Every structure is written in C-alpha cells, then in structure tokens.
Amino acid sequence: MAIKLEDKKAIVAEVNEAAKAALSAVVADARGVTVGAMTGLRKEAREAGVYVRVVRNTLARRAVAGTQFEILNDAFKGPTLIAFSNEHPGAAARIFKEFAKGQDKFEIKAAAFEGQFLAANQIDVLATLPTYNEAVAQLMSVIQGATSKLARTLAAIRDQKEGAAA
C-alpha cells in the first residue's frame, strides 16, 4: 500500500526523534508472528520504556541517518521491526530475546549500542547488561563482603592477641 509523502516524512521524523533519544537499538524480523503476540510485545516494550515500530527499510535508513544507529543500515532488509531503548540500554534486547524464545518465527537481526554493531549472535551482551538498580546491588554486595571479611580478620587478630596475653 502506498504511503503519502507527508506520512513518510512524519514517520521518518518520529523514528529519527526516537533514535536521537535512544541508548541502544535492536532490529528484528517479525514475519509470521500473530497480532496478539505482537500486541503483547508492544505492551511489554512500552512498560519498559522501549519504542517499537515496524518501518519500511528506506524510511528506516533515512530516519537513522546521522545518528549512532546508522551502522544498522545493512540490517534493514526484509520486514523490519525496530526497537529503541530509552531508559536502559539492554531493555529492548532483553525483551526481544525473551519474546523470541516463545516465537519460532521471530528473528533478531542485529543491534547497536554506543556506535557498535552487534550481530544477532552477540545480542546476549546487550541483553545481560544489569539495570542501574542491579548494578548498585552488585556493588553493595561486593562492598559488604569486603567489610565483613575485614571485620572477621580484625576479630581473629584480637582473639589471637588476647590468647597470647593470657
């Protein structure tokens, strides 16, 4: 179906704004995925602060031109579903990866993060990035472990000196 020029310009502008504000992007092929499943994916993405859109390849190339996601141009072949993570860099990759487990026909093509192209087999790198809260929790557990170890060491030294003095 033909799209009017004004509509094409609006789509390019909308996707371009999303690309400029995004931390990462993931491109997938959703051919054969049911409407109900896609609706669920879009809902989950919206809740996670991920912008998802099916875009024609030519419009996608124009929309990402001049952004850090221009490196994804080679992935814009066939039906293209593009997702931009706005709040956490791994959000789109994590959502797409989980969705792909239940959908045989859903195929992740590529991703981009900080100007680097990630092939489909490298998506795990992006999907497993901890969120801010997870990273803080990991840091706190490391600090707490070191503090506990120091306290046990000092207590052992104290006990050793008390035993030697008695």
From Swiss-Prot:
Keywords: Ribonucleoprotein, Ribosomal protein, RNA-binding, rRNA-binding. One of its GO terms (biological process) is translation. This is Large ribosomal subunit protein uL10. One of its GO terms (molecular function) is structural constituent of ribosome. Pfam families: Ribosomal_L10 (PF00466). PROSITE patterns: RIBOSOMAL_L10. InterPro entries: Ribosomal_uL10, Ribosomal_uL10-like_sf, Ribosomal_uL10_bac, Ribosomal_uL10_bac_type, Ribosomal_uL10_CS_bac. Transmembrane segments: none annotated. Forms part of the ribosomal stalk, playing a central role in the interaction of the ribosome with GTP-bound translation factors. It comes from Azotobacter vinelandii (strain DJ / ATCC BAA-1303). GO terms for cellular component: large ribosomal subunit. Belongs to the universal ribosomal protein uL10 family. Part of the ribosomal stalk of the 50S ribosomal subunit. The N-terminus interacts with L11 and the large rRNA to form the base of the stalk. The C-terminus forms an elongated spine to which L12 dimers bind in a sequential fashion forming a multimeric L10(L12)X complex. The lineage of its organism: Bacteria, Pseudomonadati, Pseudomonadota, Gammaproteobacteria, Pseudomonadales. It comes from the Bacteria.
